Amino acid sequence: MNVFLSKYVNGVDKKSRVSVPANYRAVLGKELFNGVIAYPSIRNNCIEVCGISHIEKLRQMIETLDPYSEERDAFETMIFGEAVQLSFDGEGRIILPQSLMKHAGIEEQACFVGKGVIFEIWQPQNFEKYLNAAQKIAHEKRLTLRNAH
């Protein structure tokens, strides 16, 4: 399967290492880089994580914007300027930079949330709050999926 699915909570050790779920690593196994690209989410207080191929798609989308626009500059700065390449160690762990941990409020535990082409890393209690709000929105907007093609 080529999508990130499910939710997992893993511990973060004193060296800021956290194990990426095995099925997420399997999806990323098709990438040229043995690791992930992580950057602060521009939507939520979490970390967005993907492979090199998705970063390339984001680059292509951003390049369609006017090169001198405020929006393009903001997206380039927040996604590419803040992104870090994180390699897997022999045990499938990555080291989360302090700046990303602070952005997401992560300390001792990290909640991995599959979002299809990307996954997010949350502070577990913050994700539970978000999940409650997302459930309400999904329920209210459920009919919009019927028209999606």
Swiss-Prot record:
Q: List the disulfide bonds.
A: none
**Entry's Gene Ontology BP terms:** negative regulation of DNA-templated transcription initiation
Which cellular compartments is it found in? Cytoplasm, Nucleoid
Q: Does the keyword Nucleotide-binding apply?
A: no
Q: The organism sits in which domain of life?
A: Bacteria
Leader peptide range in chain numbering? none
Domain SpoVT-AbrB per the UniProt entry, residue ranges: 7-54, 83-126
The record ties this protein, via PANTHER family, to: TRANSCRIPTIONAL REGULATOR MRAZ
Please give the family membership noted in the entry: Belongs to the MraZ family.
Quaternary data: Forms oligomers.
State the name under which the record lists this protein: Transcriptional regulator MraZ
| Source organism per UniProt | Rickettsia rickettsii (strain Sheila Smith)
Q: Which gene encodes it?
A: mraZ
